[in-house]
Amino acid sequence: MDEANQIAKDSVPRIDAYGFIRPVEFDYAVYEEFIARYRVVLTRRALKWSKLLQQSAAVEKSIKVKRYIRKGIPNEHRSHVWMVVSGAQAQMGMNTGYFRRMFIEGEKNPKLLDLVNTDLNRTFPDNVQFRKNSNPSLQKHLYNVLVAYGQHNTTVGYCQGMNFIAGYLILVTKDEEKAFWLMDALIGRILPDYYSPAMTGLKTDQEVLGDLVKKKLPAVSQLIEAHGVMWTLLVSRWFICLFIDILPVETVLRIWDCLFFEGSKVLFRVALTLIKQYQAFILEARNFPDICDKFKEITKGEFVTDCHYFMQKIFAEPGSLSKTTIDKLREKQRLQLASEEK
């Protein structure tokens, strides 16, 4: 470790604000430099958000709110804004007591309980708040949300990946019922069929990304095709975990700010920006394993640590990305998948 990194390590807490233990390879010097700049941004945004939320109907969908969300929601307002813009608040208001009923019913479902219990200790082992022996431990809250959601959405039930999403929602909302309704918004409406047994939505969007790369970054597309690498091997975790455990926590939360407001199109913007930023690095790959390694490497480093700069880039770098274009590509890929499964 160089001297600058050692000095920074002495001043930056080993455990972050969300309870995650910083990894061994964590670059303290880069982080310290970023956070000094970012605190200024956070202070400015917090003042603007406080003023906005004092107004009536402040979080209605508007150009102003969209601009504010893209620039980041302060942590103290994040839970409230996510609930309103995603429609989760309205659903919760219309379904008083529903979350509790689903949990009670779910507790009678041994298959669901087995699946949920299997993954509890695997959820964020690097987070002190999710450890079984922590006091308080978020594991019980995670269990309650996953059991209730599995009972609510019987088509999906429970599948791996959902535990990480529920965990992040609990960290942000600090409320089981809100986390449940935000999961309903994400899995039921924003990302339909990502977590269904056939995972049609997930498979479709991975191939749609392939189409977008072919159009916008043809050299990368040619390299991947030449080595017979399937997109699912490179990006399935990006999509299914919504960049959790892929990108830094604060960067993921900034992405989710936009995901709840603008929908799944944001995931394509993130993926395309990463690939475009590191295009030259990816093109150095000489074989199949090389390509896979490069795609793991591009999710680390200073570019993704500076979440504010990164978010500016995702709305600039990929260029135009209309809903019409994505809908057409999705339809094409759905038909392709259906024909392959016959």
UniProtKB/Swiss-Prot annotation:
Q: Does the keyword Lipoprotein apply?
A: no
Q: Name one Pfam family in it.
A: RabGAP-TBC
Presence of the UniProt keyword Acyltransferase in the record: no
Q: Which residues form the Rab-GAP TBC domain?
A: 72-263
Q: Which GO terms describe its molecular function?
A: GTPase activator activity; small GTPase binding
Q: What highest taxon heads this organism's lineage? A: Eukaryota
SUPFAM superfamilies per the record?
A: Ypt/Rab-GAP domain of gyp1p
Q: Which UniProt keywords apply?
A: GTPase activation
Protein function: May act as a GTPase-activating protein for Rab family protein(s).
Tell me the protein's name.
Answer: Growth hormone-regulated TBC protein 1
